[in-house]
């Protein structure tokens, strides 16, 4: 079945479902994310004017993207967080969200961090044209490295 995605801004009504499936995901569990902590993080983001999008199909939220226009070095676009519902991974949702972020970016490049152990994500971003340009040890939690990925964008 082909998904027909709509990307729109996150609303408070989206938060409970997203927080539930994020908390059930091993990657997020590695970072000690709970349903309550993630719901609070999204709610706080909304309250503080963060730019958070959701991808939905037939009114079902399948993924989210937290985008910061000048979030890297106060000049470049930054994907702060991205997540896809576990049963919709490898369905094109993540790719659509990343292409959406790239199209929104006004800078000539876009950055993101990826868990060092998340090799599936490394391959995903590399297929989209991102390159690993660095590594930060113990940045989010002790014992876990975050890899810095960057893509140069062709902006007119």
Residue ranges and their predicted role:
Residues 5, 9-89, 98-100, 104, ...:
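Acetyl-CoA-dependent GNAT
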Residues 95:
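Residues forming the Rossmann-fold NAD(P)(H) cofactor-binding site
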Residues 142-156:
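Terminal substrate-recognition subdomain of acyl/acetyltransferases
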Residues 98, 105-116:
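Conserved GNAT acetyl-CoA-binding A-motif
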Residues 89, 112-122, 138-144:
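Conserved beta-strand-loop-alpha-helix junction that forms the acyl-donor binding cleft
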Residues 92:
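Glycine-rich phosphate-binding loop
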């Amino acid at each position: 079945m082909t998904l027909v995605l709509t990307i729109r801004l996150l609303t408070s009504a989206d938060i409970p479902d997203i927080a539930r499936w994020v908390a059930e995901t091993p990657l997020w569990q590695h970072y000690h994310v709970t349903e309550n902590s993630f719901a609070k993080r999204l709610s706080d983001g909304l309250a503080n004017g963060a730019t958070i999008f959701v991808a939905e199909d037939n009114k079902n939220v399948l993924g989210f993207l937290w985008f910061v226009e000048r979030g890297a070095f106060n000049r470049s676009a930054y994907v702060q967080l991205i997540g896809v519902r576990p049963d919709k991974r490898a369905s094109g949702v993540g790719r659509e969200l990343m292409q959406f972020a790239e199209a929104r970016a006004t800078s000539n490049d876009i950055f993101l961090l990826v868990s060092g152990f998340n090799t599936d994500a490394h391959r995903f971003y590399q297929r989209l044209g991102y390159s690993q340009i660095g590594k930060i040890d113990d940045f989010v939690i002790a014992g876990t490295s975050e890899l810095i990925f960057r893509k140069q964008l062709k902006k007119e």
